[in-house]
UniProtKB/Swiss-Prot annotation:
This is Uracil phosphoribosyltransferase. Gene3D superfamilies: 3.40.50.2020. Its cofactor is Mg(2+). Uracil binds at residues 196, 201-203. GO terms for biological process: UMP salvage; uracil salvage. It is an enzyme of class 2 (transferase).
């Protein structure tokens, strides 16, 4: 399977079309990010391994399948990534949640890491690294750097976003060609201000009602 995938499920595409609209309220935007995050998790988890286990139903003993192997961790890139967490937890309620916080240096325009709070056993977990936007790729690259420094293996990291720019995809693939990238849409380009076009605006501001 390709390391880059656009998830074209009809429900995801329909909800994304509503999410993009400038008239969407903070409440609507928040709910849609939550819902699309959950649907993306369904697609991204499609290849998780299964194992046979024996259980007892009210009628008899039987063999069923359950997810095997590594436990899961959801790691949002703050702040906008927080909006995707609850939707994923609805599908995977036992997942641990870590946080990686970034801000943009106004002089260099580069991301600066200010917070890393991860499960102690993060190196042994399958990781969904989430952020609604993949614009320049700078924050995603730095977040993957942080995970790898803590001994997370590339094959255990999946970056999940809602909208990506070609520039961000290219930058992340060049820096970390060994991780998988999933997006609901690959947009046209970045504009001169670093916004994805046509995009959906500033995801953090629209999620939290700030400017």
């Amino acid at each position: 399977m390709s390391k880059f995938q656009v998830v074209e499920h009809p429900l995801i595409q329909h909800k994304l079309s509503i999410l993009r609209r400038k008239e969407a309220s903070t409440k609507e935007f928040r709910e849609l990010v939550d819902e699309i995050g959950m649907l993306m998790a369904y697609e991204v988890s499609r290849d998780l391994p299964l194992e046979d286990v024996e259980i007892e139903t009210p009628v008899q003993k039987t063999t069923v399948k359950q997810i095997a192997g590594k436990k899961l961790a959801i790691v949002p890139i703050l702040r906008a990534g927080i909006g995707m967490v609850d939707g994923i937890l609805k599908l995977i309620p036992a997942a641990r949640v870590g946080h990686i916080g970034m801000y943009r240096d106004e002089e260099t325009l580069k991301p600066v890491e200010y917070l890393v709070k991860l499960p102690a056993d993060i190196a042994d977990r399958q990781i969904f690294l989430v952020d609604p936007m993949l614009a320049t790729g700078g924050s995603a690259i730095l977040a993957v750097d942080s995970l790898k420094k803590r001994n997370s293996k590339a094959e255990n990291i999946k970056f999940v976003c809602l909208v990506a720019a070609p520039e961000g995809v290219k930058a992340l693939q060049e820096a970390h060609p060994d991780i998988e990238i999933y997006t609901a849409a690959l947009d046209e380009k970045l504009n001169e201000h670093g916004y994805i076009v046509p995009g959906l605006g500033d995801a953090g501001d629209r999620l939290f009602g700030t400017k």
